[in-house]
Amino acid sequence: MERRLVVTLQCLVLLYLAPECGGTDQCDNFPQMLRDLRDAFSRVKTFFQTKDEVDNLLLKESLLEDFKGYLGCQALSEMIQFYLEEVMPQAENQDPEAKDHVNSLGENLKTLRLRLRRCHRFLPCENKSKAVEQIKNAFNKLQEKGIYKAMSEFDIFINYIEAYMTIKAR
């Protein structure tokens, strides 16, 4: 009886820990997920880019370099968390007409994060990214303008995600 219970528990643990995307179909669905992100962003892009009065880029080349380097995993994870926890909640409150679209964009980003975690080769990380820390500091210094800046550059973020996933897929 005890042995069966142990074997059953081991099987359950393996099923729980095994990535959902063990087959290639689900791990290869990232291009469609990026298209969905771009499509969702296109619904609010004009609103946020017209309100963005800051000339300097928030998402600098150093972030892309982190994405391409050994910190890629952590940089991507931190940036997704940054957008989901700091940028999007504030962006939803900028315009009632944009709220649902920003919410939809956030849901697409959450889905992507979940899929990346389940396809472990894309997010096996634990280090900190200096570029992300700099972005967060610049964002906070911009105060209310930071929302428009971060949201107006979301397409750059999607491009960086795509670059990261292209490298990891090799």
Swiss-Prot record:
Residues 1-23 form the signal peptide. It comes from the Viruses. Residues 97-145 form a coiled coil. Gene3D superfamilies: 1.20.1250.10. It is found in: Secreted. Disulfide bonds join 27-119, 73-125. The keyword Hydrolase does not apply. Glycans are attached at residue 127. GO terms for biological process: immune response; regulation of cytokine production; symbiont-mediated activation of host anti-inflammatory cytokine signaling; symbiont-mediated suppression of host interferon-mediated signaling pathway; symbiont-mediated suppression of host pro-inflammatory cytokine signaling. SMART domains: IL10 (SM00188). Its main location: secreted. GO terms for molecular function: cytokine activity. InterPro entries: 4_helix_cytokine-like_core, IL-10, IL-10/19/20/24/26, IL-10_CS. PROSITE patterns: INTERLEUKIN_10 (PS00520). SUPFAM superfamilies: 4-helical cytokines. Keywords: Coiled coil, Cytokine, Disulfide bond, Evasion of host immunity by viral interleukin-like protein, Glycoprotein, Host-virus interaction, Secreted, Signal, Viral immunoevasion. GO terms for cellular component: extracellular space. Plays a role in masking infected cells for immune recognition by cytotoxic T-lymphocytes. Down-regulates the expression of the host TAP1 gene (transporter associated with antigen processing), thereby affecting the transport of peptides into the endoplasmic reticulum and subsequent peptide loading by MHC class I molecules. Inhibits IFN-gamma synthesis. Belongs to the IL-10 family. Homodimer. This is Viral interleukin-10 homolog.
